Amino acid sequence: MIVSPCCRIIRTCCVSNRGTFHSRLAALYPSYIKIPNNHARIFVTKSRKINRPSSSFIIDTKEARQRNSDSSTVSSDLDEILKDQTPSAQLRLVDAYRRGFQSSTDSGKSSNKMQMWRTIIIKTILFGVVSCFTIVFLKKTLVGTFPKFLDQNIGSFAENTDVSFSDVQGCDEVKKELVDVVEFLRNPEKFNQIGAKLPKGVLLVGPPGVGKTLLAKAVSGEAQVPFLYASGSSFDEVLVGLGASRIRQLFTTAKQNSPCLVFIDEIDSVGGNRTFSPHHPFANQTINQLLAEMDGFQSKEGIIVLGATNQAEVLDKALLRPGRFDVQIHVSPPTYEGRIALLNLYLKKVKTGSNIDIEKLAHGTVGYTGADIQNLVNQAAIAAALRNDPFVEMHHLWDARDRLIMGPAKRRPLDDQTNRVSAFHEAGHALVALLTADSIPLHKVTIIPRGEAGGLTSFLQEKDISFMTRAQLLAQLDVLMGGRVGEELVFGADKVTNGAADDFRKATILAQNMVKRFGFSSKIGPRVIPDTQDEQLGEATRDLIDKEVDQLLNDSLTRVRTLLSSQSKQHKLLAEALLHFETLTKDEVLAVLAGKMKPPKTQSVTSKSTTLLPQLGPSTSTEIPRMIVSLIIVHVVDFISFFCPFKDTLHTYTHTHKLLFS
């Protein structure tokens, strides 16, 4: 076929610099006059693939390169190349070119530009539509909200409270200190006439729940002045300068309502130590504004700032200097008398039975704050309502106390071996507490699981203890070791469980404090070693501390082994009673050890909430009259106890009988 050789020739000779065929072919086919340069290049490249050595029209590659380098030769040789071709061959040559390139455009650049401009226009339109919708949405939602967010008026919290000192119980010493503040607010002129300067600020320091906020409201109520409340966290915002702006608003409102009381709760959020980090150059604006405002108003204006915190150590020293917070008052958890007053206050708000022993409750709530006692009474009332009881009884309060300390009670496991281990473990704790002179008095012992514990042995302090002797601390160690030793003596060293893990943790902490903080080690001496300095100690000192701690723990284990080994019979008797009754008070424990309260010989692991008797019902016809007599006795005793209550033991006994036969 002649087309292929012609294509080979055109690759080297028939395409001029301008990318056009010469006049002869153009004259015959005027529609194919102009050949774009890019088409010519493609045509030439494609034609290289055709290699027909037998054709006489194929030109040597070296010669072709020479002709391509000479542009004049390329232009002048077309007629010579085509002059020997027949018209049909020339037509085939042109047709081959037409079919290869007519379907394409003259240049691909024009279509690429159109596509680019089309994409730009579409994206611009979409961006404009989304922007319009966003602007409309923000205009509708944030036009009224954002200015309010910026200009939040903290002074809008100003109010007159009706709380008085009679509503605050358990902190009489603090109230006496605050009476002076009330007098400052009531009659500031009396102090101004004599030349005395009123305090600008009073700082209330104490743990959470002791009543700092209630005391501040009581001061405002007693003085009959407006009460402006602000939380320290309300001054912290993302926007720079907003906290300082709110400080200015607060004191502007205070000056407009003077005389008044400004109360800033959790003041450590805004008044903490200033930072000098270059990463937070504006972090100190809020506290600096607070310091400036407290310097700015005069004591004659009748404005007193009360701050409350439980982290006084983190406050900036400039805030605590005289002239700002002049007075610091420490609010501690209530004492024994304070707890009695709080119990009387909150128990009056619920329906209570006749067997409430407030003094005993006060002994059992050592360390409780006012909020804790309020929660205790509320939980007891909830429990009574859930059981459809008409009154809050003493056992409701004790159950609420155990629930708050250890968590809700769980159903006892059915595994007898687990029950036996728990019984001998708790019996060991209780027996050591009874037989150790300096231990905290026993309150009750139970094998009902609560929280993560399989049982509980609780204690009641007869009085508030501010200081503890070495003998008392050693007694606490012995009581903690009683559980493990109780298991070991009965089941053997290889059969003990991990139930004493928490006891060992508490004992280790106590022994470390005795050595490192309390000075009860003769080898370490009277020195305090904080935990943060352990890495700074020498290796010999650390080893000595470890040896002293180990000595205290091992000596305690030895003492408890000796004690319980000599009381193995009493230990077993108490454990068997716990297996039957599940929960025993101190009086019941003493009765069991004295032989006055014996469990039945046939042990059955039952719940005290369902029975205190060896059998759940009559097994023979002879026991039916006995059950009827028991029912009559229960109702008679319950009727008498309503007017003249007996001891808690009798009340609990009759109550469980009533549950059995109801």
Swiss-Prot record:
Keywords in alphabetical order: ATP-binding, Hydrolase, Metal-binding, Metalloprotease, Nucleotide-binding, Protease, Zinc
Binding site residues for Zn(2+): H425, H429, D503
Q: Which Pfam families match?
A: AAA (PF00004), AAA_lid_3 (PF17862), Peptidase_M41 (PF01434)
- Record's GO cellular component terms: mitochondrial inner membrane
Source domain of life is Eukaryota
The Gene Ontology terms for molecular function here are:
ATP binding; ATP hydrolysis activity; ATP-dependent peptidase activity; metal ion binding; metalloendopeptidase activity
Q: Which Gene3D superfamilies match?
A: 1.10.8.60, P-loop containing nucleotide triphosphate hydrolases, Peptidase M41
E.C. no: 3.4.24.-
* Catalytic residues in the record: E426
Cofactor(s) it depends on: Zn(2+)
Q: Cofactor stoichiometry and binding? A: Binds 1 zinc ion per subunit.
Which family does the UniProt entry place this protein in? In the N-terminal section; belongs to the AAA ATPase family.
What name is this protein filed under? ATP-dependent zinc metalloprotease YME1 homolog
Q: Which organism is it from?
A: Schistosoma mansoni
